[in-house]
Amino acid sequence: MSLTKEQILEAVAKMSILDITELISMMEQKFGVSSINTIVPTSSPAETVEEKTEFDVVLTNIGANKIAVIKAVRGVISLGLKEAKDLVESAPITLKESISKDEAAALKKILEDAGASVEIK
């Protein structure tokens, strides 16, 4: 009578860690293999993450104080009243693209102080 793979797996699952370690050692000797050589790294150690240097400022919602948001947009983008109003009313919209992190943060603060919801992407 031979054991199935499932029966072997159940038997191993019931073993202690010490017994499993001994079993692995015995299998390595019997079959002439090493479990150390079979370990495959899951990610490359030389992986580097590039820091983003250009950001887009997106007006997502104008909030309750529409007039203050229009004034803030006019001030930071140098638009006329009608153009700023049309731009604000078409939210969500990208106000500025490819700007520095500091400039994006400053623009976000100005617009949020006026009552708008802003995202930096």
Swiss-Prot record:
One GO MF term: mRNA binding
GO CC annotation terms, alphabetical: cytosolic large ribosomal subunit
Keywords: Ribonucleoprotein, Ribosomal protein
Superkingdom, natural source: Bacteria
A Pfam family assignment: Ribosomal_L12_N
GO biological process, one term: translation
InterPro entries: Ribosomal_bL12, Ribosomal_bL12_C, Ribosomal_bL12_C/ClpS-like, Ribosomal_bL12_oligo, Ribosomal_bL12_oligo_N_sf
Role: Forms part of the ribosomal stalk which helps the ribosome interact with GTP-bound translation factors. Is thus essential for accurate translation.
Family to which the UniProt record says this protein belongs: Belongs to the bacterial ribosomal protein bL12 family.
PANTHER family xref list: 39S RIBOSOMAL PROTEIN L12 (PTHR45987), LARGE RIBOSOMAL SUBUNIT PROTEIN BL12M (PTHR45987:SF4)
Subunit annotation: Homodimer. Part of the ribosomal stalk of the 50S ribosomal subunit. Forms a multimeric L10(L12)X complex, where L10 forms an elongated spine to which 2 to 4 L12 dimers bind in a sequential fashion. Binds GTP-bound translation factors.
Name the record gives this protein: Large ribosomal subunit protein bL12
Organism whose genome encodes this protein: Baumannia cicadellinicola subsp. Homalodisca coagulata
